[in-house]
Structure formats: structure tokens, C-alpha cells
Amino acid sequence: MSVSSRPGRRRFALIPSAGTGTRAGGDLPKQYQPLAGRPMLWHTVQAFLASAAIDRVVVVTSPGAPALAARFPGLGFDAARLVEVDCGGDSRHASVTNGLAALRGLGAHEDDWVLVHDAARPGLTPALIARLVGAVEADGGQAVGGILALPVADTLKRADAGQHIAETVPRGGLWQAQTPQMFPLGLLQRALSEALTAQRIVTDEASAIEAAGHRPLLVAGALRNFKVTYPDDFALAEAILAGAAPTQEDSQA
């Protein structure tokens, strides 16, 4: 299956969805647990499918897993712009690396943009995607990329070994990273490969890009774009998706 023919640099969403999400509880990986009547992953995918800025959406699932369209029939997982690749690894790093290779196989180019997004951030909206894409592409032809993020608002405490407060950490200049994280395909592949060679643990794509000597752009995200991690997070996510909680696109911490 080939990619679309948008003039210039194309944009691909890459959603690693091979994780187990054990902290969220439940019998299924959290991205497949029901949220507002549909699998959490469905809400995440729909934000990208509803975005005119995205050429194709690629979901990375576990090797041998049932196809999403068969597992969740009638929910649009067979959409023309959606591709599922069952090449997930044993870590996010591995799943993203394998997903980028799969994009190459689909015909994506070195300079095409890739927006990597957590499957467990179902509060993403097309407006937030457009904000990130617009800000990164306005950064110039040599833009290295950028991420959605929020300035830290809470007071931060560093704990000692006994879980007592050791110190207060100044929050000035600190941001809480979100996703999507948007980078050129080739640059991101090289950065992740270098991190693996150096046995460097990277918790997101921006960490690898930073370690390679680049400075990604910080673009204001939104509170609704939080990561579902613990059992109590499901109720909050459902409230946001139902419109029962503040959902202003520009809301910040």
C-alpha cells in the first residue's frame, strides 16, 4: 500500500499500541479497554483521521495480534487512511523504531514528518494537531520538530529514599511533555538508533532528538490531552470526551 501524494513533505501519524499498560488495571491492555463505549484507541485514531493535516495514520500493534478491524468490527479500523502494522516491540523505543521502518516500507521519505502519539491520550483533537503542525512548520525549512507540552504549574518536590521531601524543585522553565511529538522521519530514525547504540534510555522521541544535539520546539498542549495511566483516569477521560469537564483547546496548567 503506497502513501498519499500530498505535494511537499507529507505528514504521518504513528501510534505505538503494543504496550500492556498494567498500571491501568483491567483484563485488557489499556488502549483496548472501553472508554465512552468504544476502545480507547478508537478515540485516539479518530482525532488523526478527522485531521486534514495528516496523510496517513499508522498503528503499531503486537506481532500476531488479531487485526483491529476484525477485533473491533464496524468501528472504522479499516479506514482507507489507516494502516496497521504488527511489528511492535518490547518497549516504546522498539515499537516506534519498528514503526518508522514500516513507514519506509510504505514509501515514506527521509524528510516526511512523523507525529508519534501515545495510544493512551484519547483527548487529542484535530485542533491540537493543527496547532503543533502549524507551529513546527512555521519554524522554518530547517525545523527540527517539536512536541505538545504544558508549562508545569504545580510545586515540585524531590523525595529522599524514605519518601520524605528532600527539596523543592524550582519549576521555572519546566514543561510537562505530551504527544504528538513531530520530527522528520530520517532524523528520528537516526536519533533512536544512536540512543540504542549508546544504551541510553529514552522515554519519548524528544529525548532522543535532544541527545543528538537538537532543540525541539515546545508547543502549548491542553489539559485534556493527558495520558490515561491509572484506573481513576478512565472516569476523567470519559468526562472530557463527553464534554462534562473543561475542554478548551487553549487551556493550560
From Swiss-Prot:
Its EC number is 2.7.7.60. Pfam families: IspD (PF01128). Signal peptide: none annotated. The record marks R171, K227 as: Positions MEP for the nucleophilic attack. It is an enzyme of class 2 (transferase). One of its GO terms (molecular function) is 2-C-methyl-D-erythritol 4-phosphate cytidylyltransferase activity. Pathway: Isoprenoid biosynthesis; isopentenyl diphosphate biosynthesis via DXP pathway; isopentenyl diphosphate from 1-deoxy-D-xylulose 5-phosphate: step 2/6. Gene3D superfamilies: Spore Coat Polysaccharide Biosynthesis Protein SpsA, Chain A. It catalyses: 2-C-methyl-D-erythritol 4-phosphate + CTP + H(+) = 4-CDP-2-C-methyl-D-erythritol + diphosphate. One of its GO terms (biological process) is isopentenyl diphosphate biosynthetic process, methylerythritol 4-phosphate pathway. InterPro entries: IspD (IPR001228), IspD/TarI (IPR034683), IspD/TarI_cytidylyltransf_bact (IPR050088), ISPD_synthase_CS (IPR018294), Nucleotide-diphossugar_trans (IPR029044). Keywords: Isoprene biosynthesis, Nucleotidyltransferase, Transferase. The record marks R23, K30 as: Transition state stabilizer. Belongs to the IspD/TarI cytidylyltransferase family. IspD subfamily. Catalyzes the formation of 4-diphosphocytidyl-2-C-methyl-D-erythritol from CTP and 2-C-methyl-D-erythritol 4-phosphate (MEP). This is 2-C-methyl-D-erythritol 4-phosphate cytidylyltransferase. It comes from Ralstonia nicotianae (strain ATCC BAA-1114 / GMI1000) (Ralstonia solanacearum). The gene is ispD.
